[in-house]
Amino acid sequence: MKRYDTLHVWKLIKLLICKFLLFHDFGTALFTSLVKASMLGFHNWRRTYWLYLKKLRPINDTYDAPFAIGCKNVAYEASQYPRMNATFMVLARNSDLDGVLSSMNSIERRFNRHFKYPYVFLNDEPFTTEFKKAVKDATDSSIQFGVLDDELWNFPKDVDKDMIDESIAEQVGVVYANFPSYHKMCRFFSRNFYKHPLMQQYEWYWRLEPEVTFSCDISYDPFYYMDKHNKVYGYVIAIKELAKTVPNLFRYTVAHQKISNLPTTDLWSFFLDKRYETRIKKLKEEQKDQGYYVLPEPPLNRIDGQIYNLCHFWSNFEIARLDFYNSKEYNEYVDALENAGGFWTERWGDAPVHSLAVGLLLNRSQVHYFRDLGYQHSTIQHCGQEYGCNCDCPFNIPDYETKPGSCINEWASVMGGFLDE
């Protein structure tokens, strides 16, 4: 064994020991992590060491601070503070049962066995007896099941069906865009989920998807702390959207902003790419003596001097006040998007729609980054290991915050910067 590798092995072991002594139950978590590390094979030690050294950079918390660092006394939190008028909301098909149970088992073990918030399950067709029994057996909390009517789920009846079908068929090469059901789902989450009668009874909601994993204990009530700190919207991952899915969404958004005379919020710059304007300014300075400019074509999503950087809050996890979605301002915005037809002529996702609405209507102090939570969906995860409680994140998947497609730099910028700069 090379001395270089030996030193890195011992450094990793010491790092793991220190980390889990500080933040975790030593006996269980350290053993589990070392077993996972050994299974990777020795040739991956250096990569694994790098992943563990990749610290999350501290962010200015003037406008948004973690609700907890480490573990709170969950028994005290659950017994002393009132429950909010809140629910989990799950959109699922009967065929999603296994994935739903996996997500429920995770959130129940990490959080809801202590706080017992109810669930609302929605489907575009009736749930089977098997589905209902299985999810009821997975929790002690109350559950309600709802079916979506045509108005909430299907495309508008006054829009030509052949035109919709042709538009969707033409979106070849755009991820999920050839599936009408995917367009319907994105439209439903963008403008209709909060209108269902079962959702109208609640003030807060927490979206729960099938096949997600919560990898840290949540030892406090996010709903209570959101309310206490005057937060309206909470997220756990901020990521770049695929440009082909939203070629004109930003244009329609800025147009609506101007038509409606909406003031620019202090969060709006989170969504703006300033590199093009900086480049143009530099090129003009370099070419000022030649009498003319040779400039690149502006991006397609540029409007009124603004360019969308494709950042959005990943809405498969979000905690939000429902009066935000029920507000006149939000519904005027999504009505404008509906009239533009982008839910079928393009593949607008609900995540960028929600996010741009948040940027239009909320200030930065009203949005919370759940940096202490651990959350994984598919191969993308955020691990709250340095802030969270009893985290057990997949050992070989880097925190998305440390990857190129993350929007952490944009978030830090709008929040006042990284503290280590």
Curated annotation (Swiss-Prot):
The active site is at 318 (nucleophile). Pfam families: Glyco_transf_15. One of its GO terms (cellular component) is Golgi apparatus. Keywords: Cytoplasm, Glycosyltransferase, Transferase. Signal peptide: none annotated. Gene3D superfamilies: Spore Coat Polysaccharide Biosynthesis Protein SpsA, Chain A. It is an enzyme of class 2 (transferase). Belongs to the glycosyltransferase 15 family. Probable mannosyltransferase involved in O-glycosylation of cell wall and secreted proteins. This is O-glycoside alpha-1,2-mannosyltransferase homolog 5. It comes from Schizosaccharomyces pombe (strain 972 / ATCC 24843) (Fission yeast).
